[in-house]
């Protein structure tokens, strides 16, 4: 057996296979090199013939290349759905070949997400989407030179209009059967003093299953915001920088209030904020799109649904031509 994906779900799949006595010959991964728990990691081209478990929540991105390679694929859910992960010390290799620890709670969250999205893919009659990034502000408490969301280019950053956001949320939920997760982003979301009102609107929607708030831990939520954040759908994703001066008080409050969170250090930096003409060929553009880590991060901004945050902000900054085919006006859907 082969496992496509050497991340945490791939590691869980390996443990489940070993428990069931299923031999695993190798992992397939194009970002991670070396081996994981004694199993070699190879490229898809170098993989042997046989059956392969797909472990990415974005299962559709794996199916095409696997079928072109002539391999028979299965969802990893076939082996991890009822697998008991208690007692396992989870450590997976990330894209920088460094160990990254995961709490059992977060591992279970990742498993549920993967299984849910695989199940949705197997039932295409439902109009579902894995995640939508909701951009609540252009304002940020940091000024990262190569910010992937292009915040460094806003000369007069503003918060998103609250009424427009609430109307857009209602409209898009009317059109969809399910949105698994809405990712609340900025800038820094807590620069918007009305953030809690947005979170309230999101958690009220039955079709929205999870609400993720991405923060750099430089700003504490206001007292009046906490009640809205204390919802079973809400989870904080904290990126730790040297400037994350509110990290410890924030974590203390999250734990005190029973709010789920994941906190990880910013271990590396990707230079992906170049606004310039590259003169690439169509095949080169297609190759870049296939390998893009953000191509499934649909983004809501100013009443429009874009393919990713970079695209949304490039349009807002008038840095790219305004092609109507590149976004969806939600009110017209």
List each language-model region with its residue ranges:
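Glycine-rich adenosine-cofactor-binding loop
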Residues: 1-17
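Conserved alpha-helical substructure of the radical SAM core
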Residues: 102-213, 220
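Non-cysteine beta-strand/loop elements that form the S-adenosyl-L-methionine
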Residues: 233-243, 262-266
């Amino acid at each position: 057996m082969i496992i496509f994906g050497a991340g945490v779900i791939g590691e869980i799949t390996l443990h489940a296979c070993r428990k069931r006595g299923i031999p695993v010959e190798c992992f397939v991964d194009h970002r991670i090199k070396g081996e994981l728990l004694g199993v070699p990691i190879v490229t898809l081209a170098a993989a042997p013939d046989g059956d392969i478990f797909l472990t990415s929540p974005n299962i559709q991105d794996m199916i095409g290349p696997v079928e072109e390679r002539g391999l028979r694929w299965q969802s990893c859910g076939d082996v991890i759905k009822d697998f008991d992960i208690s007692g396992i010390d989870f450590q997976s290799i990330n894209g920088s070949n460094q160990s990254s620890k995961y709490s059992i709670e977060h591992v279970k969250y990742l498993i549920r997400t993967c299984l849910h999205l695989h199940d949705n893919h197997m039932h295409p009659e439902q109009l579902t989407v894995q995640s939508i990034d909701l951009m609540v502000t252009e304002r940020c408490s940091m000024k990262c030179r190569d910010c992937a969301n292009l915040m460094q280019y806003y000369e007069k950053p503003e918060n998103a209009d609250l009424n427009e956001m609430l109307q857009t949320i209602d409209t898009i939920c009317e059109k969809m059967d399910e949105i698994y997760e809405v990712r609340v982003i900025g800038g820094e979301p807590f620069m918007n003093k009305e953030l809690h009102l947005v979170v309230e609107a999101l958690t009220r929607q039955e079709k929205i299953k999870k609400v993720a708030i991405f923060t750099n831990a430089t700003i504490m939520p206001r007292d009046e915001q906490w009640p809205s954040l204390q919802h079973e759908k809400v989870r904080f994703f904290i990126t730790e920088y040297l400037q994350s001066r509110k990290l410890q008080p924030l974590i203390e409050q999250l734990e005190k209030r029973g709010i789920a969170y994941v906190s990880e250090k910013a271990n590396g930096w990707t230079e992906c904020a170049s606004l310039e003409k590259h003169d690439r060929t169509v095949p080169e553009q297609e190759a870049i799109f296939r390998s893009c880590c953000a191509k499934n991060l649909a983004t809501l901004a100013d009443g429009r649904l874009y393919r990713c945050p970079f695209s949304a902000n490039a349009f807002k900054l008038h840095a790219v031509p305004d092609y109507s085919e590149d976004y969806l006006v939600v009110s017209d859907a």
